[in-house]
């Protein structure tokens, strides 16, 4: 599910084909290892490179890394287990190796030489990933932000123009949100925004994308036609109406949806969905409207 929030930016497991370990492998070129590990800012690629180096020089056929925020895996998950703790940027990490055979004293020394080389490139990659996430996602709701939305909508509309599937856009707005903020304060308002983000997140499908683009305005890019967008609107309105806090504070939502045509640009699709949203508000709010020109 891509809300632009993600969840994780990278998959937990990343397998990388390695050269088979040979007891006659040449000595480790530590300078070359450093260069290889610094070649990427993708944590999974850095970790896969680390695993490949280990597999070439030591009887290691798999390694996993785990911290509070990261899980990375390379190679096989069976063998003789060896667990080690390292500190990366002040964060404790657990490395669990899967060995073909127990390490000899010289092999243990080799591992101790290679292991510290992982820390700085992995820390760089993790920090870059975190900055990328912050640049793409709304801090309050965890949904995509305006910048991520703009790029995603252009890409989605381009696919529709190439006849690679239907794309619709839903524009959502909270009813009575300003009154809530004025009466109960911004802390309460932030709580409602976060809860609404959770409602959207739990309502959309894995192929849809949700964003908060400002204030109490949200959008959803739907991979489907106007009827698919309508079903999603129904789920969101129903979930909002049955949410205790929304009922308590007198907040509801209005939605408008439109489907992209082969000749429509991204901004035109937004304008059509936004126009339909205001038709929903004019109809009494707490409802949704679909672009009438696209219903058949």
UniProtKB/Swiss-Prot annotation:
Knockout consequence? Answer: Deletion of the gene does not affect the growth of MR-1 in batch cultures, but it leads to a strong reduction of c-di-GMP production. It also results in impaired biofilm formation and decreased current generation during growth on electrode surfaces.
Per the record, a Pfam family? GGDEF
Q: Which residues bind Mg(2+)?
A: 173-174, 216
- State the UniProt keywords alphabetically: GTP-binding, Magnesium, Metal-binding, Nucleotide-binding, Transferase
Query: Cofactor note from UniProt?
Result: Binds 1 Mg(2+) ion per monomer.
What does the record give under GO molecular function? diguanylate cyclase activity; GTP binding; metal ion binding
Membrane-spanning residues: none
Biological process GO terms, please? cell adhesion involved in single-species biofilm formation; negative regulation of bacterial-type flagellum-dependent cell motility
Entry's Gene Ontology cellular component terms: plasma membrane
EC numbers? 2.7.7.65
Induction (UniProt): Expression is up-regulated under medium flow conditions in electrochemical flow cells (EFCs).
Top-level EC class as recorded in UniProt: transferase
Q: How is it used?
A: Shewanella oneidensis MR-1 are electrochemically active bacteria (EAB) that form biofilms during growth on electrode surfaces, thereby functioning as effective catalysts for the interconversion between electric and chemical energy. DgcS synthesizes c-di-GMP under medium flow conditions, which activates the formation of biofilms on electrodes via c-di-GMP-dependent signal transduction cascades.
* Necessary cofactors: Mg(2+)
Q: Which residues form the GGDEF domain?
A: 165-293
- Catalytic activity, reaction form: 2 GTP = 3',3'-c-di-GMP + 2 diphosphate
Q: Where is this site: Transition state stabilizer?
A: 178
Enzyme active site: 216
| General function of this protein | Catalyzes the synthesis of cyclic-di-GMP (c-di-GMP) via the condensation of 2 GTP molecules. May be involved in the regulation of formation of solid surface-associated biofilms and pellicles according to environmental conditions.
Protein name (record): Diguanylate cyclase DgcS
Gene transcribed to yield this protein? dgcS
């Amino acid at each position: 599910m891509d809300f632009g929030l993600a969840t994780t930016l990278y998959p937990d497991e990343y397998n990388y084909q390695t050269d088979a370990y040979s007891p006659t492998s040449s000595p480790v070129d530590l300078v070359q290892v450093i260069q290889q590990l610094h070649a990427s800012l993708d944590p999974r690629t850095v970790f896969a490179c680390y695993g490949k180096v280990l597999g070439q020089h030591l009887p290691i056929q798999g390694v996993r890394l785990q911290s509070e925020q990261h899980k990375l895996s390379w190679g096989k998950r069976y063998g003789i287990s060896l667990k080690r703790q390292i500190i990366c940027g002040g964060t404790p990490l657990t490395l669990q190796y899967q060995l073909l055979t127990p390490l000899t004293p010289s092999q243990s020394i080799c591992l101790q030489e290679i292991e510290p080389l992982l820390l700085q490139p992995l820390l760089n990659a993790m920090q870059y990933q975190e900055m990328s996430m912050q640049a793409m996602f709304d801090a309050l709701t965890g949904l995509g932000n305006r910048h991520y939305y703009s790029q995603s909508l252009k890409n989605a509309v381009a696919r529709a123009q190439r006849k690679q599937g239907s794309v619709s856009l839903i524009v959502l707005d909270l009813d009575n949100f300003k009154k809530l903020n004025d009466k109960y304060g911004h802390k309460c308002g932030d709580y409602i925004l976060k809860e609404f983000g959770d409602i959207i997140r739990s309502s959309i499908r894995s192929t849809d994308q949700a964003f908060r683009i400002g204030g109490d305005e949200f959008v959803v890019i739907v991979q489907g036609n106007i009827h698919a967008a309508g079903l999603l609107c129904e789920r969101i309105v129903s979930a909002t109406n049955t949410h205790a806090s929304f009922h308590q504070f007198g907040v509801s939502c209005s939605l408008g949806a439109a489907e992209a045509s082969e000749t429509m640009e991204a901004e035109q699709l937004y304008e059509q969905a936004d126009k339909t949203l205001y038709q929903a508000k004019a109809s009494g709010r707490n409802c949704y409207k679909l672009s009438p020109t696209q219903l058949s």
